[in-house]
Design a protein with these regions (language model features):
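Short, conserved turn/kink motifs that form compact alpha/beta structural patches or helix kinks used as
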Residues: 4-7, 20, 25-106
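Polar/acidic, low-complexity leader/linker segments enriched in S/T/G and N/D
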Residues: 1-2, 9-16
């Protein structure tokens, strides 16, 4: 069972949708699905060199209440930060909580 105090961050679940710009060209936009309480644990980061520039990557585990419709196509918005969902785990298959392994999109 998850205690209410454990989930102390408000996050927004978003899904990508293709829409058309004013010229009729397809563009990807993100649409809010739900706002939920969660706990964000930043687990580390790394710097790497790619495409002739230095990049940084931060990983996190986000814990939230169970939602049957969760998918890795979604992303998490927390304030002005965005997280790509890499995997979703249902600890012990109890359908009480989900652990989302994520990386921050910079």
């Amino acid at each position: 069972m998850i205690s209410a105090g454990e989930l102390n961050k408000r996050i927004i679940l978003q899904i990508a949708q293709l829409k058309q710009d004013s010229y009729g060209e397809p563009i990807e936009t993100w649409t809010d699905i739900a706002t939920v309480w969660a706990n964000i644990i930043t687990s580390g980061g790394r710097e790497f060199y790619a495409a002739q520039k230095m990049n940084a990557e931060t990983t996190a585990v986000i814990k939230m209440r169970y939602r049957a419709a969760m998918h890795t196509r979604f992303r998490i918005k927390y304030g002005n930060r965005y997280f790509e969902i890499l995997s979703i785990a249902d600890p012990e298959e109890h359908h009480e909580s989900l652990l989302l392994s994520c990386k921050e999109v910079v």
